[in-house]
UniProtKB/Swiss-Prot annotation:
Keywords: Disulfide bond, Knottin, Secreted, Toxin. The presence of a 'disulfide through disulfide knot' structurally defines this protein as a knottin. Heterodimer of A and B chains; disulfide-linked. This is Toxin CSTX-14. The lineage of its organism: Eukaryota, Metazoa, Ecdysozoa, Arthropoda, Chelicerata. It comes from Cupiennius salei. Its main location: secreted.
Length: 48
């Protein structure tokens, strides 16, 4: 299955972010201003 690219929406599938040996992207959620529901995007994991 295709993975979700960095900065793309992963709200509906939070374990879909792309990863490789060099990096691991994680789905990070936030509430945009004025939004009633959260928005999640794949971001680079800061731990590596």
């Amino acid at each position: 299955s295709d993975c979700t690219l960095r900065n793309h929406d992963c709200t509906d599938d939070r374990h879909s972010c792309c990863r490789s040996k060099m990096f691991k992207d994680v789905c990070k959620c936030f509430y945009p201003s004025q939004a009633k529901k959260e928005l999640c995007t794949c971001q680079q994991d800061k731990h590596l």
